[in-house]
Amino acid sequence: DFNCLPGWSAYDQHCYQAFNEPKTWDEAERFCTEQAKRGHLVSIGSDGEADFVAQLVTNNIKRPELYVWIGLRDRRKEQQCSSEWSMSASIIYVNWNTGESQMCQGLARWTGFRKWDYSDCQAKNPFVCKFPSEC
């Protein structure tokens, strides 16, 4: 059994919280790293986790913007584009909105916060943080 901090929700041995205060992607990632050891913007690894996060956003983001930041952004190196999670996990599960895989990624409101879509990294959006729970 494991515990999350007060105000955080547990799923599959990780703790999650949705935050209403709009931040840029970098500001949100920095905020998440300050909340807990190994904290980052949320990574999503399965349909079940996507459902959990979508429900968390629906229940906790008071005035949802078009996007809610997740921990995925494009890294551009020598004309090669690759997406990676902020927590440096490799991408195994993907759920892009059709044709979208550039800039910073957010959960799109018009998909019920289930599909990923791009947004300008400097846009200010609500966000979800995630960290591994302590045993």
Curated annotation (Swiss-Prot):
Pfam entry (one) = Lectin_C
GO MF term list: toxin activity
Report disulfide bridges, numbered on this chain: 4-15, 32-129, 104-121
Fetch the Gene3D superfamilies from UniProt. Mannose-Binding Protein A, subunit A
UniProt keywords (A-Z) are: Disulfide bond, Hemostasis impairing toxin, Platelet aggregation inhibiting toxin, Secreted, Toxin
Q: What does this protein do?
A: Potent inhibitor of collagen-induced platelet aggregation. It acts by binding to the integrin alpha2A domain and blocks collagen binding to integrin alpha-2/beta-1 (ITGA2/ITGB1). The gamma/delta subunits mainly contribute to this activity.
Q: Which organism is it from?
A: Calloselasma rhodostoma (Malayan pit viper)
* PANTHER family, sorted: MANNOSE, PHOSPHOLIPASE, LECTIN RECEPTOR RELATED
Q: What is its main location?
A: secreted
Name of the protein: Snaclec rhodocetin subunit gamma
